[in-house]
């Protein structure tokens, strides 16, 4: 081989070597760039993700606090409502008899006036009439409130009558009521005082 050919061959090898080194350097740079790009992108996404999570947590905490405050307000309102209703019930219990007492006051006034008048005039017939009128007024008041007298004719009934004694009487049948010692009353279907009676026993 000639010297010229040898020189050209050596030159070609050197050129190829330099070209290969350049190519390798470019590949290393590209790989490094891709790695940095990926790593950088991952870091960026991580920071963005943390920021997003913090915002969501903050919103949830705010909502929980709002719900808590709303619950406390509702609880306070309910407690106030309960106390108010309890007070109203206490007032109703305290003054439940006010209406009926007010109605009886008129009859009491009439009775006192009738007594005073009879003492001055000695007219006891007028006193009797006055008392009878007062009794009628009282019965009217009771009737308006749903109070009625328990019937005592016929057979003894333990639901409505309270037997305090027995009596053998030919004019009555067995277990019939012979005598009424105290009248009984019902209020709107409920026995508020049974009639006190004597029952016939043969």
From Swiss-Prot:
Provide a Gene Ontology MF annotation, just one: protein-folding chaperone binding
Tell me if NADP is a UniProt keyword of this record. no
What are the cysteine partners in each disulfide bond? none
A biological process (GO) of this protein is: protein folding
The record's section on PROSITE patterns has: GRPE
Q: Name one GO cellular component term.
A: cytoplasm
Region Disordered, residue ranges:
21-52
Q: Which domain of life is it from?
A: Bacteria
Its annotated compartments are:
Cytoplasm
* Listed Basic and acidic residues bias regions: 21-37
Q: Which UniProt keywords apply?
A: Chaperone, Cytoplasm, Stress response
Q: Where is the composition biased (Basic residues)?
A: 38-51
Record family assignment: Belongs to the GrpE family.
**How does this protein assemble?**
Homodimer.
Give the function comment from the record. Participates actively in the response to hyperosmotic and heat shock by preventing the aggregation of stress-denatured proteins, in association with DnaK and GrpE. It is the nucleotide exchange factor for DnaK and may function as a thermosensor. Unfolded proteins bind initially to DnaJ; upon interaction with the DnaJ-bound protein, DnaK hydrolyzes its bound ATP, resulting in the formation of a stable complex. GrpE releases ADP from DnaK; ATP binding to DnaK triggers the release of the substrate protein, thus completing the reaction cycle.
What is this protein's name? Protein GrpE
User: Which species?
Assistant: Fusobacterium nucleatum subsp. polymorphum (Fusobacterium polymorphum)
């Amino acid at each position: 081989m000639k010297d010229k050919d040898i020189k050209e061959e050596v030159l070609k090898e050197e050129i190829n070597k330099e070209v290969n080194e350049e190519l390798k350097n470019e590949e290393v740079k590209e790989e490094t760039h891709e790695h940095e790009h990926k790593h950088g992108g991952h870091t960026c996404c991580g920071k963005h993700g943390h920021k997003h999570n913090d915002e969501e947590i903050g919103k949830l905490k705010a909502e929980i606090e709002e719900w808590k405050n709303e619950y406390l307000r509702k609880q306070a309102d309910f407690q106030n409502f309960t106390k108010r209703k309890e007070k109203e019930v206490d007032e109703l219990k305290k003054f439940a008899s006010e209406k009926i007492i007010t109605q009886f006051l008129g009859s009491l006034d009439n009775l006192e006036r009738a007594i005073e008048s009879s003492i001055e005039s000695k007219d006891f017939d007028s006193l009797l009439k006055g008392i009878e009128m007062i009794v009628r007024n009282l019965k009217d008041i009771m009737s308006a409130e749903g109070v009625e007298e328990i019937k005592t004719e016929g057979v003894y009934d333990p639901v409505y009558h309270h037997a305090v004694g027995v009596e053998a009487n030919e004019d009555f049948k067995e277990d019939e009521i012979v005598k009424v010692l105290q009248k009984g009353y019902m209020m709107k279907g409920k026995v508020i005082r049974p009639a006190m009676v004597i029952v016939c026993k043969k």
